[in-house]
Swiss-Prot record:
This is Fluoride-specific ion channel FluC. NCBIfam families: crcB, PRK14195.1. Na(+) is not transported, but it plays an essential structural role and its presence is essential for fluoride channel function. It comes from the Bacteria. Fluoride-specific ion channel. Important for reducing fluoride concentration in the cell, thus reducing its toxicity. It is found in: Cell inner membrane. Keywords: Cell inner membrane, Cell membrane, Ion channel, Ion transport, Membrane, Metal-binding, Sodium, Transmembrane, Transmembrane helix, Transport. It catalyses: fluoride(in) = fluoride(out). The chain crosses the membrane at residues 4-24, 32-52, 68-88, 100-120. It comes from Allorhizobium ampelinum (strain ATCC BAA-846 / DSM 112012 / S4).
Length: 125
């Protein structure tokens, strides 16, 4: 039961943070491209690498911390389904260049962000 509580608490915080990032990116860049989803997926990719190293090295692979931060917080913060919907919405505008760029950039930079998070985690912890 405690795992469920950790996941729920982390998920609640992650969901609110995701909402705020969406609001901020629309205010900064407008609604033309899904910068909110793009941003949370890159930030989340970096953080999953960082948190994985931190938990493994500093917290003796704590299952509780993993449930709170990775499953809960990052699970609520990032979302693959929003990424897919944003991609289809861009494609339905009739120009396939933007959705192709969005998918390629999200995957490419996302993988890079995980590597960066792992490297920073190894350096810090």
């Amino acid at each position: 039961m405690k795992d469920v509580i950790y996941v729920a608490l982390g998920g609640a915080v992650g969901s609110v943070l995701r909402y705020w990032v969406g609001i901020v990116t629309i205010r900064l860049f407008g609604p033309f491209l899904p910068w909110g989803t793009f941003s949370v997926n890159l930030i989340g990719s970096f953080c999953i690498g960082l948190f994985a190293e931190m938990i493994a090295r500093k917290f003796d692979a704590s299952a509780d911390l993993r449930m709170l931060l990775i499953t809960g917080l990052l699970g609520g913060f990032t979302t693959f389904s929003a990424f897919m919907l944003d991609t289809v919405s861009l494609a339905e505008r009739g120009d396939l260049l933007w959705p192709a760029f969005y998918v390629a950039a999200s995957i490419g930079f996302g993988v890079g962000a995980v590597f960066a998070g792992l490297a920073v985690g190894r350096w810090l912890f």
